[in-house]
Amino acid sequence: MNAARCFGQATVLLTAISIARAFGLSGPTVISAGLLTALLMLIAWRDGATAADLGLAREDMRAGVRYGVGAFGLVLLILVAIALIPGTNSFLDDSRADISGGRLIYELTISIVLLTAIPEEFAFRGVLLGSGVRLWGPWRASLITSALFGLWHIVPTLHTMSDNRAISSASNNFAGQVLLVTGTVVATFIAGLVFSWLRLRSRSLIAPILAHIATNGLALLIAWFVAH
């Protein structure tokens, strides 16, 4: 595997898409996510990545499911606790949860699973982490790819920071925006480390995909129940 070329090309691609999103040039998410995944698959194939490098080896699927289900359950417990504690449940008061039941199903199944969790995990814990491990070893690769994962979330945070009513007031000034973006980058960096650990421990991409779905999907689901 040409790990250096694979990592470099994937990083350039992700940077280009992130810049395009910042200027509203990436088009519909279904197109940009599909294009990202297809190009990453091409990069991985041309550079000789194996199924094991990408976390897609069949023999590791069972471990991936086991670790992923465990992570899913842990996230559920944490979010339920947040929803039940008066001092923290305001963080689930998000205008993005003010949607119909039909729209909720679409967001959970299409937007979160197919257009977010799977493409992002294939990119960061599949192609980048797989090639990064060959270049620097597991822990340095985890740190680098998790940092990139945090930076990837700058543009979405700028677009959605006013949706959460608990923090929307902070988005009204530049200092507040910097604080919110920095907090999101740090939080997603930590999440990236956890997802990387799941991927390395189980050797399967299924584990971080399930954890990612839990983090995004269960948060939206519980916020929807809070809103309704």
Model-derived segments and spans:
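Alpha-helical transmembrane segments in multi-pass membrane proteins
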Residues: 1-47, 63, 67, 98-107
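Structural signal for the C-terminal ends of transmembrane alpha-helices
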Residues: 42-51, 198-201
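Aromatic-anchored segments of alpha-helical transmembrane domains
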Residues: 10-22, 75-81, 146-156, 215-221
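Juxtamembrane helix-loop-helix connectors linking adjacent transmembrane helices
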Residues: 51-119, 134, 163-175
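Transmembrane helix-loop-helix hairpins at the membrane interface
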Residues: 105-228
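Hydrophobic alpha-helical transmembrane segments
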Residues: 4-22, 48-56, 87-92, 130-137, ...
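N-terminal start-of-chain detector that recognizes signal peptides
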Residues: 14-16, 24-27, 89, 169, ...
